């Protein structure tokens, strides 16, 4: 009996140590180390909000492409999936289906004003103009379908906003089944952006720069008549750029690294909750940036001028 318990313990330990990726990833020698390495999932993966677990962000099927962004000193890896969502990788033993983004049909409404990727099996592209009288922007009746993974029908209405801010509102079809001529902006139902992924399983994805500094990928869960954001640990940016001013990086290696004006840089991540937004002020960013020498660190730019926040 004692030998059996030892054997089971060894099997469990080996299972827990099974590789998550097709490449070997070693623990870093510092709290966080940037890798930026493309790989594949060696098993089904669950991306979580925290390094040791926490709420789920996304599920990835085995053999799917991933990019390993960061590794901590305990060997936990922060990755992004093919869509661009980030999370800490864990082995997914739940048997739950992976996020469904492949095979969706692309449709466009309003002269490229809005782009949708949807599943025609559970939703119908309407491509109708609902309203747009006087100086109000045109409202597009874009889709109708079962978007929450159940039998409930939803409409998707979109408009460009009074100041050119594209947004879409997702709401249950009224009891009489008729399509309203308009719908009001609702913080619980309306998302900013022009590109949407609607697989029909209760998840809604956006890929947009509307009201944002960088192109950002987000995920929401549709529950009843509300949309709830799925919180990612970081937002992936992945943009090559040039420094508009000289600034200093707080390096992941604990050192300070200068970046000269005009130097090529790569903006990797945004930590969206590092600096809480203040009312009536432009929200500040905390960006993970790599300089031309390959040094990686954090910087808080002045969002008014583009300079480093002193």
Ranges and model annotations:
Residues 1-16:
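Gram-negative bacterial Sec-dependent N-terminal signal peptides
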Residues 19-31, 58, 67, 80-122, ...:
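Boundary regions of SH3-family modules and the immediately adjacent low-complexity/disordered segments
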Residues 20-74, 109-110, 115-128, 236-282:
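Beta-loop motif signature
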Residues 46-48, 76-80, 217-225:
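Short beta-strand segments and strand-loop junctions that repeat across beta-rich extracellular domains
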Residues 71-72, 82-83, 157-165, 173-175, ...:
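Short, flexible beta-strand-to-coil junctions
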Residues 145-156, 200-203:
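Acidic, glycine-anchored loop motifs typical of Ca2+
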Residues 160-161, 179-258:
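Short aromatic loop motif centered on NTY/YTY
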Residues 165-168, 213-217, 260, 284:
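Short, surface-exposed coil-to-beta transition loops
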């Amino acid at each position: 009996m004692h030998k059996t318990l030892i054997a089971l313990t060894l099997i469990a330990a080996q299972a827990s140590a099974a590789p998550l990726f097709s490449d070997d990833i070693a623990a870093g020698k510092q709290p966080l180390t940037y890798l930026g390495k493309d790989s594949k999932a060696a098993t089904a993966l669950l991306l979580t909000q925290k390094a040791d677990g926490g709420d789920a962000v996304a599920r990835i099927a085995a053999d799917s492409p991933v990019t390993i962004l960061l590794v901590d000193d305990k060997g936990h890896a922060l990755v992004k999936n093919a869509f661009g969502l980030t999370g800490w990788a864990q082995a997914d033993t739940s048997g739950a289906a992976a996020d469904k983004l492949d095979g969706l049909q692309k449709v466009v409404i309003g002269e490229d004003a809005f782009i949708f990727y949807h599943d025609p099996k559970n939703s119908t592209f309407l491509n109708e103009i609902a309203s747009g009288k006087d100086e109000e922007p045109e409202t597009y009746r874009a889709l109708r379908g079962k978007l929450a993974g159940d039998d409930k029908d939803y409409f998707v209405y979109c408009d460009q906003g009074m100041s050119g801010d594209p947004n879409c509102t997702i709401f249950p079809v009224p009891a009489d089944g008729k399509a309203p001529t308009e719908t009001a902006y609702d913080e619980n139902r309306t998302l900013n952006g022009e590109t949407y992924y609607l697989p029909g399983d209760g998840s809604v994805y956006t890929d947009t720069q509307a009201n944002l500094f960088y192109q950002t990928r987000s995920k929401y869960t549709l529950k009843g008549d509300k949309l709830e954001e799925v919180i990612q640990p970081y937002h992936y940016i992945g943009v090559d750029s040039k420094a508009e001013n000289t600034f200093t990086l707080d390096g992941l290696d604990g050192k300070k690294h200068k970046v000269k004006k005009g130097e090529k840089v790569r903006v990797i991540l945004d930590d969206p909750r590092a600096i809480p937004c203040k009312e009536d002020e432009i929200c500040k960013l905390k960006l993970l940036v790599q300089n031309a020498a390959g040094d990686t660190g954090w910087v808080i730019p002045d969002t008014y001028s583009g300079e480093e926040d002193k």
